[in-house]
Amino acid sequence: VVGSDVVAHASSYQKPAQADSIHGFDHVIFRRAGAVAADYGCISGHVLELTLPEELEEISSTRIREAVDANRDISHLIDPVAQEFIYRHSLYLREPQDKPVLRTEDLEFIPCGSEDGQLEALLHRSAPAGAQSLLQALGRTGDDVLLLCHGKERTVLGAATYCCMDSQHLFSRLGSAELAAFVRQNAGGRTLLLSGLFVPSSPQQEELGQLLLTEVLTLALGREYTYAIYEPLEGFADAWIRQELHLQGFLPVPEGVSRSALAVDMRQPIILSNNVDTTIKPPLSTAPSVVAAVAAAHRRLQEMLTHLQPGSLVLSLSAGVIYHRLLQRITECNGVPEVQTVPRRLGPDICVPYGKLLRGVIVPNTVTKTLRTDKVYEPDLSSYSIEAYPDYSPLEDQVRTIRAFDRPAILVDDVLHDGKRIRRLDPLLRRTGTEVKKVLVGYLTGTGRDLMESLGYDAEGVYYLPNLRMRFVESTLDPFIGGDTIRRSQRPEGGLQPSVNRVLPYASPEFSPLDPETAWALSLCCVENARNILLALETEYRRAFARNLTLSRLSEAVILPLCPDKGGSMAYDLSRGASTYLDDDIELLKRMRFGRKETTV
């Protein structure tokens, strides 16, 4: 059963007919009144063409969505049973009718030389008093320069200067025998030297500085450098840079070695995926108060993670940058432009996101079909399995659907480390004969690369990280915003999914052994962060729509709303805001502090 426009434009009908292809199926085809008659000559099966009565022609998904958003009755537009299902599960709230097309960001990292005129102009803006001396120092040291540019005009927003050193070059570059000896004793391999971070003062200074630091650090990690040191160029030092480096885990070297240097061990970094902004629906996701709350929460979590393994690198990876670079690689692999063409020109491959990345979006000029997978825990957290996301077809059927497109698949995910999702999908892909052209991920670890070689897949990551100590996905730490699904026979109403966040008071942290006080502090940080973000969302929602953002309407603000599982006998009041429940959880968590001392009032 299809519309006449599908027969006219869908690529499956434009392919040559073959055994078991869609051309041999019997068809019921609906044609709108007044539409140009379509050519059904490609269909060898029986064709029955129908047109709808005029009163039904007025019914459209657009009208239904508008009525749902306005909380109006839709019984005259849709079957009452379907209406009840839509309202019970809070479907279509603030949802676009069509999947949004993923767009490339306008940020670009460009290496350049110290004599580049763009660098000189930037230094005069960010350090006007010492610009010339800095240029002279860069000329003497020969450090590499990385520019952060914006837009087609490549406006320079910031720059980082660095040098990758072997042990025999430490003294010649650092100019201090004590500092060279300190690095040689602690590095255990090649060393990255950060000599400068130049970003003009602005509200975005910290964000742009973080992007530059991440780019330089991941560049060094990909080359298997094991240690990093910050020693500013002569005559250049800035307090905000030291604060940014502190959030990456850098610590001061002993005072007898150097008064200005900071250092960090990069052998087993702690990875933090900065993705909360991708879980919030527009227009709330771009509201200044929400953006500020998300940014403040991220920096607070970064600070907290530096206490887990003092002196080890805490690497923050921006989901926005990963999206941008994955888009470039997907379209390049598919041989199509990065910007949607008109008319659309599809490449030969199909993009298949199989994790939490790129859900509900379309890659430009590329057939995009998401494999809806979910990590589902047993109620006691004793085990979990990779299954189909609730209300979606079983994984076997989803894979067969992918195979039916008869296109080589580009599998996409945010991370490939232990590979639990791809291990679950691999037998299904092989059983159906689905061709996997490439596996593209946000970051690929050494363990993940070994797994892909053993399975015979060609895998590539935006970032390559040989080792990691721990990895955190920020959204999964935030109650009501993210988490992992809990298996329950009955789901809560309001479109909420029972879930668990692996922090107190919902569960014991799953990360490598933490002392009780650190585990408690990390948990408090995460729950308070979620509360602050939800408060900002509730305030902005009230301002924009003149009503409260309650649990029953949380799906208007959060793409995949979840609720912390409290057991089968506990139910949420859907008329309350999510932040009020987190206030209660924070109070409960404060009762659980280890070694808490009572005070007399």
Predicted regions located by residue number:
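Short, charged/polar "capping" segments at the starts of alpha-helices
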Residues: H9-A10, G34-Y40, G235-I241, L358-V363, ...
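Conserved acetyl-CoA-binding loop-helix of GNAT-fold acetyltransferases
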Residues: G175-L179, T191-V199, Q204-G222, D418-P427
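Conserved GNAT acetyl-CoA-binding A-motif
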Residues: T191-L194, A220-E234, K437-K438
